[in-house]
Amino acid sequence: MTPLSSPLSQYWQTVVERLPEGFTETSLSVQAKSVLTFSDFALDSVIAHPEWLAELESASPQADEWRHYAGWLQEALAGVCDDASLMRELRFFRRRIMVRIAWAQTLSLVDDETILQQLSHLAETLIVGARDWLYAACCREWGTPCNPQGVPQPLLILGMGKLGGGELNFSSDIDLIFAWPEHGETRGGRRELDNAQFFTRLGQRLIKALDQPTMDGFVYRVDMRLRPFGDSGPLVLSFAALEDYYQEQGRDWERYAMVKARLMGDNDDAWSRELRAMLRPFVFRRYIDFSVIQSLRNMKGMIAREVRRRGLKDNIKLGAGGIREIEFIVQVFQLIRGGREPSLQSRSLLPTLDAIAALHLLPENDVAQLRMAYLFLRRLENLLQSINDEQTQTLPADDLNRARLAWGMKAENWPQLVGELTDHMANVRRVFNELIGDDEADTPQEEERSEPWREVWQDALQEDDSTPVLAHLADEDRRQVLTLIADFRKELDKRPIGPRGRQVLDQLMPHLLADVCSREDAAVTLSRITPLLAGIVTRTTYLELLSEFPGALKHLIMLCAASPMIASQLARYPLLLDELLDPGTLYQPTATDAYRDELRQYLLRVPEEDEEQQLEALRQFKQAQLLRIAAADIAGTLPVMKVSDHLTWLAEAMIDAVVQQAWTQMVARYGQPAHLDERQGRGFAVVGYGKLGGWELGYSSDLDLIFLHDCPMDVMTNGEREIDGRQFYLRLAQRIMHLFSTRTSSGILYEVDARLRPSGAAGMLVTSADAFADYQQHEAWTWEHQALVRARVVYGDPQLTSQFDTVRRTIMTTARDGKTLQTEVREMREKMRAHLGNKHRDRFDIKADEGGITDIEFIAQYLVLRYAHEKPKLTRWSDNVRILELLAQNGIMDEHEAQALTVAYTTLRDELHHLALQELPGHVAQTCFSKERALVQASWRKWLVAV
């Protein structure tokens, strides 16, 4: 074996001082000295358990010892009598075996492929051992789950990702999906449970046994977000539910994830065979599927954006030419041809590479280079993680860990290791780009067009010198353009830009100036773009993005020219520049029913336990989607109603994710309220009022929300830290408000206003559904009933949603005195106008002035409250356009008036959207919209002025 390098020999003296009693420097073998110097994890472990070191010194780990893991664990669990002792034994066993694997890996006693197998077998052994012990315990407590024929039902566990592929890294999360075969009930227990409840409780206990940190550490971080519907879906699904989901709703990325899916503890019984057969058609298509390339290209772009977003330098997994790109290369062939070529259906990467070579899908030399690069990168990754049992793929910056890795990788020193790594990653990147790369390049014509602007940029030409290229501009615009360029150059002198940044900027600016200055509005556009550039000049990756992708630069210029709001957003949040890379998605917002799924996929890249990154990711997703909606709005591909629909669906997806995150955090701390043991759902609802409730959000709208629960009195939570159930829901609502309003580097998520709750700011933040109903019936003012017209549940389980809808319908269909209602609605409108009146009397406030949007909303609300007791169908919708439609359909308002009000309403809202894109206030000249205003005022007089 390789002797320790000089830096590590020096560090050995520090190790000696920490050796457990009974071990001396002279009593240890060279092997022990090497491992304990290399890995702090191994050193800490043998200090706590000196017998492990003696065991390793007497008999080295063997390549095939994974075959004994199940037997060893069975012995360890033989005396376990409760969940606490189970958790202790699982953690003890995992640490002991991980030390053995670290020993074998550091000393190269077994090859790197075997190390990956051992790590995967260990995880599988622990998962299956914990499941089987807990299944038996749950059966003793609640009976055995059976189908209607009385056949016992098992819990099947799909290991995803590297666990499924038998390629787990040293310190890794495990991605799991739980399933059970058939519906039914438990038999033989103290009381019957349906199978869904049984397996959900079993799944929760299994996750806790593996994932929960204790004084002994944890076994594995368990990630369940790959299951159907992610965190918002059931924890465990029946086979039928799984099949329905993957047939009807399975996404491309879920198909890729399923390639590596493997049943944990698969004994090839009938249930296992059924599940495998059910999933196979979803993963491997019978035809050759070339759509995969674009889907994987999109995923590649997502990862590239992630690297930029998080500043992931020196990342051997996600960086260019890293492990993820090798995985993508292999998946391309699996997903295109796997349905026709069984040899490509392997879950493991290296056997699939062999199949790719055998089928001549890649040149032999490329396959050989990919194999060498993969084994090199995986060894480097595992060594890096085994130093501290830490989940990282980023190369270290300190000298000690660099010396450790250089020695472990058999390099003379760190520079030599980096050189070898660079060569391997360059080979991977080359093959990757040839296969699915889509980098753009300048054409000779573009170079020729930008050449005169190189002089303008680099030589700081005076006005006379630059006249030919700016001749099409007016004198004032020409002077302004040159001043902007000169001021920008002065600003750059104050910034710490490195040589690479200067070089990229000098490549970029001639192209940018050529495009901007060919426009009639060159001065305005350049004035919006230079602040953005000033903000990113020290972040070379963004300059490179604009320089290397001319299409992205063109879209940047077009959008900044069209909207100062977009320019401001891009300047404030440069990561949004990534959205400019794909015009196919930039001007085509996410489908209205797909926001939740896209957000779920986006959040999967962020560790579930990292709250800070989760908050950032939520904000970044929202900003990216807002940009796409605004771009489509500017391009004219989205009418005003659709703009608001998209903004509303986006907000609902964000609400869903925030509630999920808050719920997860609260349940981890307190458990869940015990009344939920007897029912599905969370007993919690979020009601949207105002623009959210009415599907009418604008670009900068806040969210009017109230929170409801159905928790009975005297219910406690079932966690280790018990609290009152209603207190749980109050803290949940407070947590939700916190997650929305916390300001991160990406800003806040939404401004949230909860003052529409019963008793307003003086009332409880969260209200029971019964108390809400009582308040609405006996205490609420007329204006609160008006607000209820535009209210709907935006998050909640079906039971609470139905309860709220019943309350809303009951209130709205209550018979009212027409004159009294007319007076109260009119007086409320007059109060609003006095309080929020237009301060610019020479301007028309589109929302607040007479004949504006609010008048139309009040007309609709008044008519619903006035006539819904006769025409209950008026309560169906919460948005003004469909309410006006209902009023016409039910004979309350004639069709011509309803249509005219609808046109006026959408016209005024369209103008508000476009003013927002221009960062202008919501008022216009008094002469504007005179026809619409006159029509609205006439309708107001007809319905709301007493006769």
From Swiss-Prot:
Q: Name one GO cellular component term.
A: cytosol
Gene3D superfamilies registered for this protein in UniProt: 1.20.120.1510, Beta Polymerase, domain 2 (3.30.460.10), Glutamine synthase adenylyltransferase GlnE (1.10.4050.10), Nucleotidyltransferases domain 2 (1.20.120.330)
The record's GO molecular-function terms, alphabetically, read: [glutamate-ammonia-ligase] adenylyltransferase activity; [glutamine synthetase]-adenylyl-L-tyrosine phosphorylase activity; ATP binding; magnesium ion binding
Q: InterPro entries from the entry?
A: GlnE, GlnE_rpt_dom, NT_sf, PII_UdlTrfase/GS_AdlTrfase
Report which reactions are catalysed by this protein.
[glutamine synthetase]-O(4)-(5'-adenylyl)-L-tyrosine + phosphate = [glutamine synthetase]-L-tyrosine + ADP; [glutamine synthetase]-L-tyrosine + ATP = [glutamine synthetase]-O(4)-(5'-adenylyl)-L-tyrosine + diphosphate
Swiss-Prot/TrEMBL keywords: ATP-binding, Magnesium, Multifunctional enzyme, Nucleotide-binding, Nucleotidyltransferase, Transferase
Question: From the record, what ranges are coiled-coil?
Answer: none
Cofactor(s) this protein cannot do without? Mg(2+)
Cite the EC number: 2.7.7.89, 2.7.7.42
UniProt-listed SUPFAM superfamilies: Nucleotidyltransferase (SSF81301), Nucleotidyltransferase substrate binding subunit/domain (SSF81593)
Q: Which GO terms describe its biological process?
A: regulation of glutamine family amino acid metabolic process
Region spans: Adenylyl removase = 1-440
Specify where the region named Adenylyl transferase lies, as residue ranges: 450-947
* Pfam families per the UniProt record, alphabetical: GlnD_UR_UTase, GlnE
Domain of life per record: Bacteria
- What family classification does the UniProt entry report for this protein? Belongs to the GlnE family.
Question: Which PANTHER family does UniProt cross-reference here?
Answer: BIFUNCTIONAL GLUTAMINE SYNTHETASE ADENYLYLTRANSFERASE_ADENYLYL-REMOVING ENZYME, GLUTAMINE SYNTHETASE ADENYLYLTRANSFERASE
Q: Which NCBIfam families does the record cross-reference, listed alphabetically?
A: PRK11072.1
What does this chain do?
Involved in the regulation of glutamine synthetase GlnA, a key enzyme in the process to assimilate ammonia. When cellular nitrogen levels are high, the C-terminal adenylyl transferase (AT) inactivates GlnA by covalent transfer of an adenylyl group from ATP to specific tyrosine residue of GlnA, thus reducing its activity. Conversely, when nitrogen levels are low, the N-terminal adenylyl removase (AR) activates GlnA by removing the adenylyl group by phosphorolysis, increasing its activity.
- Name of the featured protein: Bifunctional glutamine synthetase adenylyltransferase/adenylyl-removing enzyme
